[in-house]
Amino acid sequence: MLCMLVLLGPGCSTDQETANLPPAAEVKAPPVASPFQQELDRLGVPLRLPARGKAIVVNIPAFELIAFRDGMPELRSRVIVGSPRNPTPVVETHVSAVRFRPRWRPTPSMIASGEYADKIWPPGRKNPLGLAAIRLGEGFLIYLHDTNRRSLFEREARALSHGCIRVQRWDELIGWVLDIDLDEVHRHANGRRTFDVQADPIPVYLGYFLRFPQGDGAVAEFADVYRLGTSLGPQRDATYAASDATCAGG
């Protein structure tokens, strides 16, 4: 040890001192992109899914919602999106809460069109929001919701709403969002109370992708229903401005 001290100088440490040093901090490697994310990247789709946890993507021209976990699809549903006159906005937001048995009041443009009377619709199966609605962001009045016109999901072209997204498999989506089973979803939806359940802030992407992977190696191409082309720069704001940007009272 004396020889080591001479060679290394007074700053050297003994074996005992070295043993007492705290272990080096573990450096964690970034999560590997999921196979689906790799397909998105290969196609040049401008969408970055969380590598861990849940996310919801609505591809407007595909009329489809996909619920992802750890970057992989877990639930797919047909949806009805905004019409070209009242387009669904292209935005990134998050789940805020789930409202069971919502009330509803139409937007001013709906009233002006004569499509709906200016009144508050009570909860129930005749309500245009259906039996439940997923609220997005704080103060963001675009919902993912059930509908009283479920036969419209049979149409191939489903750009029919005033901006909100009607979800065919709404009950399964709500069960997935809240981590509850379908029996509990239906019990709340068919009950007598109107109430909110706070939800985790799951990221929600309302996107406009004309090419999108299907998860089996195939790539689907979709019609440009809003005539936005492939570049969504200034068109993004224009799309939002053209939409009602609200489902009105819920």
Language-model segments: what does each one mean?
Residues 11-250:
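N-terminal pre-domains immediately preceding structured catalytic cores
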Residues 1-9:
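Bacterial N-terminal signal peptides
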